[in-house]
Amino acid sequence: MSDVAERVKKIVIEHLGVDADKVVDNANFIEDLGADSLDTVELVMAFEEEFSVEIPDDAAETIVTVGDAVNFLEKATAA
């Protein structure tokens, strides 16, 4: 697991209070992890703070799974 993936997983576990074994790449924040719309906004803000990046609204709308977040953040931090 990449450093980005580990950091994303830690943030998701802390913000949503879910078991680590549920936080897998294809886990949907809302459908699988029980997040609501406010939770997803807070997750995006936490990702921005942790990785020192800005996630535009149009990109944030496409981040619906743990894997989506990891992929976006790996690209954003590699630039």
UniProtKB/Swiss-Prot annotation:
One of its GO terms (cellular component) is cytosol. One of its GO terms (molecular function) is acyl carrier activity. The modification O-(pantetheine 4'-phosphoryl)serine is found at S37. It holds the Pfam family PP-binding. Gene3D superfamilies: ACP-like (1.10.1200.10). Residues 2-77 form the Carrier domain. Pathway: Lipid metabolism; fatty acid biosynthesis. It is found in: Cytoplasm. 4'-phosphopantetheine is transferred from CoA to a specific serine of apo-ACP by AcpS. This modification is essential for activity because fatty acids are bound in thioester linkage to the sulfhydryl of the prosthetic group. GO terms for biological process: lipid A biosynthetic process. PROSITE patterns: CARRIER, PHOSPHOPANTETHEINE. Keywords: Cytoplasm, Fatty acid biosynthesis, Fatty acid metabolism, Lipid biosynthesis, Lipid metabolism, Phosphopantetheine, Phosphoprotein. Belongs to the acyl carrier protein (ACP) family. HAMAP family: Acyl_carrier. Carrier of the growing fatty acid chain in fatty acid biosynthesis. This is Acyl carrier protein. It comes from Methylocella silvestris (strain DSM 15510 / CIP 108128 / LMG 27833 / NCIMB 13906 / BL2).
